[in-house]
Design a protein with these regions (language model features):
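Hydrophobic transmembrane alpha-helices
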Residues: 2-84, 88-89
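Membrane-interfacial segments
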Residues: 40-41, 45, 71, 75, ...
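Membrane-interface alpha-helices at helix entry/exit sites of multi-pass transporters
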Residues: 76-82, 162-169
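Transmembrane alpha-helix/helix-exit interface in multi-pass inner-membrane proteins
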Residues: 87-108, 138-146
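Membrane-interface interhelical connector segments
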Residues: 97-127
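Membrane-embedded alpha-helical bundles of multi-pass transporters/translocases
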Residues: 118-137, 141, 154-160, 168, ...
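A structural feature that tracks compact, well-ordered secondary-structure segments
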Residues: 173, 181-191
Length: 247
């Protein structure tokens, strides 16, 4: 019980220390990533598969990389669990909203109102196996990404310049995204949608490439945010709390 109280206190201090905009973007990206994953992307080859979740999934990893570099992998993982819990709460809200009798604005197509309305309810309400798969996949990828990022930082010769930040971010994001995509594909797409193992692996690899490229594009702004945090001593309360609790 004392351990639980300690963890709750630690997380509460952490949430006060992480800039609110960063945490907000992180949580919003996790929620929208899972919602957009309902739409697949048409690709020219049958063995390739991607969904629209890749539009924002890179933002989740960018936030995790910045938090990991400044606060450490445990803090980034705790923030990830908070994002997951908020996402589960929003999924419950979406599910309840989908069960409320009514008509969606986009369903007003003569002769197809009921079909379109039902499809929109199904998309917003979601299904248990997609939610389960996406939750497990994100938790696994967050842990892999955060601790890989931290480990790469420890072996880097110069851990304060952009080159070092970019190296650890690109590699950890690539590995984390591959784990995310593959875990989701194996749990959901392979079991429920009939994807072959080849499609699962290719989807994971293709998504990893696309999302890592997004990380490359936006990594420099992430690095500048990190420098601003360091300059303004962001997270002082958290660091002092962790130092005191370690004694």
């Amino acid at each position: 019980m004392n351990r639980i109280k300690t963890e709750v206190k630690e997380v509460s201090v952490l949430l006060r220390s992480i800039p609110s905009l960063t945490m907000t973007l992180f949580i919003v990206s996790v929620i929208t990533m899972n919602l957009l994953a309902n739409k697949s992307i048409n690709l020219p080859f049958s063995f390739m598969a991607l969904d629209c979740g890749i539009v924002v999934s890179w933002l989740s990893f960018l936030c995790m990389d910045v938090i990991t570099k400044h606060f450490g992998p445990k803090a980034a993982t705790q923030a990830s669990f908070v994002a997951v819990l908020v996402n589960l709460g929003m999924c419950l809200v979406f599910f309840l909203a989908s069960k409320i009798p009514g008509v969606w604005g986009e369903s007003y197509v003569e002769g197809a109102e009921a079909i379109i309305n039902g499809a929109l309810d199904g998309t917003i309400g979601g299904t248990w196996y997609v939610l389960f798969g996406s939750t497990i996949a994100f938790i696994v990828s967050a842990i892999v990404n955060n601790y890989t990022n931290s480990m790469l930082g420890k072996i880097s010769n110069n851990n304060s310049d952009f080159k070092s930040y970019a190296f650890r971010s690109y590699v950890s994001t690539g590995i984390g995204q591959f784990c995310d995509n593959l875990t989701f594909a194996l749990i959901v797409s392979h079991q429920f949608f009939g994807w072959t193992l080849v499609q699962c692996v290719v989807c994971a690899f293709t998504g990893m490439i696309v999302e890592t490229l997004c990380e490359v594009i936006f990594s420099y702004p992430g690095f500048k945010i990190l420098q601003n945090w360091q300059k303004n001593k962001v997270g002082r309360e958290y660091f002092e709390y962790m130092k005191e609790s370690s004694h």
